[in-house]
């Protein structure tokens, strides 16, 4: 069968675990401070949603109402070493006077946590392999217990290195949101030139990815040229412009879009009922920056 599959992708290998403090800025957006990289991440266990979904029956409908509890993701992180960033900044441990040891306090700290998963995909058009990352962000993550470990005595068979397992939970953040909605977790996929720019930015200074973070090399929508028109009849508000429902992107792909027409005062207008004047059409698609096109409507002569 000849089917149009997407590009093939695989993800492998964790790296660059970053913890940071997050507060709400004066503009209402997240502000991050005290970025630290945590060394030794081995794996991240399944972050399972513990919230229950309940259906409430009424009349002859079994799901008259459906309610889901608040999202609570629980899982674990495994480390092959526990350094200062993990002990002090996540587990809230107290350093000893001589600087050589740490003791638990039970005062676990809530952090914004981000880590990367390396990825590779084969472009379905060119067949080329493209490297990238899946960026995983937990805006509001808290340990729920001290890190556990298991050690064994060395023998002729050798011994495995000790690994520390840290139980964690993630909840929705009042500050970090996507489209105005609070999220307990978010994942980004970045490829090619954007991935290179991401790595360059990260190497110049640790940062947390956000929904409005702009990276160089992004694939963008190509704004169309909309022909100017006249009204259907003289003196009436019955102008109709040609508004495409698909656009090309900067890579030549075809993208389905939605559009909104606004007049010179920013008021939404209805196609087919356009008065003489200048209009701006805004095109939107998931995963792309909006683009606009101008068009004018003149009165029928």
From Swiss-Prot:
The entry's keywords: Viral genome ejection through host cell envelope, Viral long flexible tail ejection system, Viral penetration into host cytoplasm, Viral tail protein, Viral tail tube protein, Virion, Virus entry into host cell
Subcellular location: Virion
Chief location of this protein within or outside the cell: virion
A single cellular component GO annotation: virus tail, tube
Domain free text: The C-terminus probably makes protruding decorations on the whole length of the tail tube.
Subunit composition and interactions: Homohexamer. Interacts with the tail terminator protein.
Protein purpose: Forms the cylindrical rigid tail tube with a 4 nm wide central channel for DNA ejection. The tube is composed of 31 hexameric rings.
Name of this chain's protein: Tail tube protein
Organism whose genome encodes this protein: Lactococcus phage p2 (Lactococcus lactis bacteriophage p2)
């Amino acid at each position: 069968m000849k089917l149009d599959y997407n590009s093939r992708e695989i993800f492998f290998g964790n790296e660059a675990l970053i913890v940071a403090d997050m507060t709400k800025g004066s503009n209402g957006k997240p502000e991050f401070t005290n970025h630290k990289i945590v060394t030794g991440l081995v794996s991240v266990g399944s972050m399972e949603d513990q919230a229950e979904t309940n259906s409430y029956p009424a009349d002859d409908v079994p799901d008259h109402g459906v309610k889901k509890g608040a999202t609570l993701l629980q899982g674990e992180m495994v480390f092959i070493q526990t350094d200062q960033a993990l002990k002090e900044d996540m587990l809230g441990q107290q350093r000893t006077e001589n600087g050589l040891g740490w003791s638990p306090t039970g005062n676990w700290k809530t952090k914004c946590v981000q880590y990367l998963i390396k990825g590779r995909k084969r472009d379905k058009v060119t067949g080329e392999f493209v490297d990238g990352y899946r960026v995983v962000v937990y805006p509001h993550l808290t340990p729920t217990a001290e890190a556990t470990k298991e050690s064994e005595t060395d023998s002729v068979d050798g011994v495995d290195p000790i690994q520390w397992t840290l139980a964690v939970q993630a909840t929705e953040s009042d500050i970090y949101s996507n489209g105005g909605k609070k999220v307990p977790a978010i994942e980004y996929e970045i490829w090619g030139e954007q991935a290179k720019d991401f790595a360059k930015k990260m190497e110049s200074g640790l940062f947390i990815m956000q929904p409005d973070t702009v990276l160089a090399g992004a694939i963008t929508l190509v704004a169309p040229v909309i022909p100017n028109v006249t009204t259907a009849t003289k003196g009436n508000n019955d102008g109709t412009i040609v508004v495409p429902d698909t656009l090309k992107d900067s890579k030549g792909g075809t993208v389905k879009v939605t559009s909104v027409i606004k007049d010179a005062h920013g008021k939404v207008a209805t196609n087919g009922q356009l008065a003489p004047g200048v209009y701006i059409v805004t095109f939107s698609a998931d995963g792309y920056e909006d683009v606009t096109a101008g068009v004018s409507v003149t009165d029928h002569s």
